[in-house]
């Protein structure tokens, strides 16, 4: 039975005339919309909204939520997404009246506590990353990437170095890296990976030149491998006059152990909604702060939060700033959660996060390599990439394995990424999962590998137990239906 057979759309449940609210008679004169808006902006007919009782609304969305899956539901090993548990103390603090009930248009003097939290969070992130200054304005990871690249662009233009139009990106990089570079107005140059899954330094030397604006790197990279030649790569890029950009997607693998700033990076962006336990996976909100070294501080987006004798204030006096990149001052609620997490864990706790994240990933990798191909057989960091090529020869593809995991109440790992690995299966267990959970997932993956050999049809036709079976994902991506259209 499919979900659409048991759960109609909320529009399809609608009964004309049914209401879910009652209001007292208005005690002020009624006015017409035409008194305030031009006729072009006024509906000619009422909006076709669902008409339901409050109880029907509650049941509809509660039932929908029961078919959803999140970190609180089960294991979510989505590689490169750091789907760790989000401590509920974060939610409690974010709901403090002094945080939840304030408005960004209030006078600075009335929100000094909130500004102090933001300033302290900036200071903590400076220490964690090894940068000299941090802005909390960017709203998410890719937004942070773009902001950091715009700073680099502004830096080069300020120095009259307008020929630097190219950003170098590894072939194993996140897809957002080349996209962000292109949106920032740069041309993308790809540097190859070597046989060990690391940046090929010899190839980097070939592509670096006077037109290089920056090299974007994730370290550890998207294969979960630490770029051991990072210091040499930094020297190569800096000698050519370029900047080194750190994609902080994988900071969970090195946090409180090593710092991007100490490796030679000039700009970093962080994903507070990932590494620092803001809830994510539902489309937002996120938080993608960037940190910079001293020579890039003048180009930070304004306003810049500063501390003076009289208190905390926003400084707009940055004539070389790239300007605002978001209304107001970032996604405050996610920043509160990240601050709470950092203060709760402390330096020693953050170090343990890294150690357990790396331990869990290596434990799983060694347990699974007997049944799946391991393209790069070496110690990994927080995540690792398997290949389903062995199963593909039996007629079972990686997408089939992912769908079969749904029958066992596991969210699938990231699949078919990074692109340099055929039939890729990228697994990131995070530090918050127990050995029992890891073992259960391992056993299931081994069982699926055995099914691929002995009964491939059961894997090829999965999932069997979910309300929604296989969707036409290609059609959904290319011809999405984004709004309800009533049948006439």
From Swiss-Prot:
GO cellular component, one term: glycine cleavage complex
GO biological process: glycine decarboxylation via glycine cleavage system
Matching InterPro entries: GcvPB, GDC-P_C, GDC-P_N, GDC_P, PyrdxlP-dep_Trfase, PyrdxlP-dep_Trfase_major, PyrdxlP-dep_Trfase_small
Protein name: Probable glycine dehydrogenase (decarboxylating) subunit 2
Essential cofactor(s): pyridoxal 5'-phosphate
Single GO MF descriptor: pyridoxal phosphate binding
N6-(pyridoxal phosphate)lysine, modified sites: 274
Catalytic activity: N(6)-[(R)-lipoyl]-L-lysyl-[glycine-cleavage complex H protein] + glycine + H(+) = N(6)-[(R)-S(8)-aminomethyldihydrolipoyl]-L-lysyl-[glycine-cleavage complex H protein] + CO2
Key word Oxidoreductase present: yes
Pfam family, one: GDC-P
PANTHER family, sorted: GLYCINE DEHYDROGENASE (DECARBOXYLATING), MITOCHONDRIAL, GLYCINE DEHYDROGENASE, DECARBOXYLATING
Transmembrane domains' residue ranges: none
Protein origin, superkingdom: Bacteria
EC number: 1.4.4.2
Taxonomic lineage: Bacteria, Bacillati, Bacillota, Bacilli, Bacillales
Keyword Nuclease appears in the UniProt entry: no
The protein's role, per its UniProt record: The glycine cleavage system catalyzes the degradation of glycine. The P protein binds the alpha-amino group of glycine through its pyridoxal phosphate cofactor; CO(2) is released and the remaining methylamine moiety is then transferred to the lipoamide cofactor of the H protein.
Complex formation: The glycine cleavage system is composed of four proteins: P, T, L and H. In this organism, the P 'protein' is a heterodimer of two subunits.
């Amino acid at each position: 039975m499919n979900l659409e057979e048991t759960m109609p759309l909320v529009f399809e449940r609608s009964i004309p005339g049914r209401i879910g609210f009652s209001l007292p008679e208005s005690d002020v004169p009624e006015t017409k919309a035409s008194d305030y808006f031009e006729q072009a902006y006024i509906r000619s007919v009422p909006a076709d909204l669902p008409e339901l009782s409050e109880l029907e609304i509650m049941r509809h969305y509660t039932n929908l939520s029961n078919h959803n899956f999140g970190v609180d539901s089960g294991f979510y090993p989505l590689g490169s997404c750091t789907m760790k548990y989000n401590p509920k103390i974060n939610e409690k603090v974010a709901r403090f009246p002094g945080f939840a009930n304030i408005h960004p248009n209030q006078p600075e003097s009335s929100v000094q506590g909130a500004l102090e939290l933001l300033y302290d969070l900036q200071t903590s992130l400076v220490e964690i990353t090894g940068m000299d200054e941090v802005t909390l304005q960017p709203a998410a990871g890719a937004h942070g990437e773009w902001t950091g690249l715009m700073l680099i662009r502004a830096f080069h233009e300020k120095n009259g170095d307008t020929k630097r139009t190219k950003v170098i990106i590894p072939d194993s990089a996140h897809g957002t890296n080349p996209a962000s570079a292109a949106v920032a107005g740069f041309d993308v140059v790809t540097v190859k990976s070597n046989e060990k899954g690391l940046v090929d330094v010899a190839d980097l030397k070939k592509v670096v030149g006077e037109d290089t604006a920056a090299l974007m790197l994730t370290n550890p990279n998207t294969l979960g491998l630490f770029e051991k030649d990072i210091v040499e790569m930094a020297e190569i890029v800096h000698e050519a006059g370029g900047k080194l950009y750190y994609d902080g997607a994988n900071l969970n693998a090195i946090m409180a152990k090593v710092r991007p700033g100490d490796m030679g990076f000039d700009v970093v962006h962080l994903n507070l909604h990932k590494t620092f336990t803001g809830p994510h996976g539902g489309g937002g909100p996120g938080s993608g702060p960037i940190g910079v070294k001293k020579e890039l501080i003048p180009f930070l987006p304004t306003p810049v939060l500063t501390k003076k004798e009289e208190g905390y204030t926003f400084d707009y006096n940055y004539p070389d700033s790239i300007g605002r990149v978001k209304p107001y001052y970032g996604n405050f609620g996610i920043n509160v959660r990240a601050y709470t997490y950092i203060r709760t864990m402390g330096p020693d706790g953050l170090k343990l996060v890294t150690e357990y994240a790396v331990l869990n990933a290596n434990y799983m990798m060694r347990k699974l390599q007997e049944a799946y191909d391991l393209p790069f057989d070496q110690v990994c960091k927080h995540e690792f990439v398997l290949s389903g090529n062995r199963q593909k020869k039996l007629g079972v593809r990686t997408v089939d394995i992912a769908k079969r995991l749904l029958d066992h109440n596991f969210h699938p790992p990231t699949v078919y990424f990074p692109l340099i690995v055929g039939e890729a299966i990228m697994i990131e267990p995070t530090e918050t999962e127990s050995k029992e959970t890891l073992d259960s997932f391992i056993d299931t993956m081994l069982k699926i590998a055995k099914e691929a050999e002995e009964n491939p049809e059961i894997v090829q036709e999965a999932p069997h137990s979910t309300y929604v079976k296989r969707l036409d994902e290609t059609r959904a991506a290319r011809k999405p239906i984004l709004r309800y259209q009533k049948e006439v």
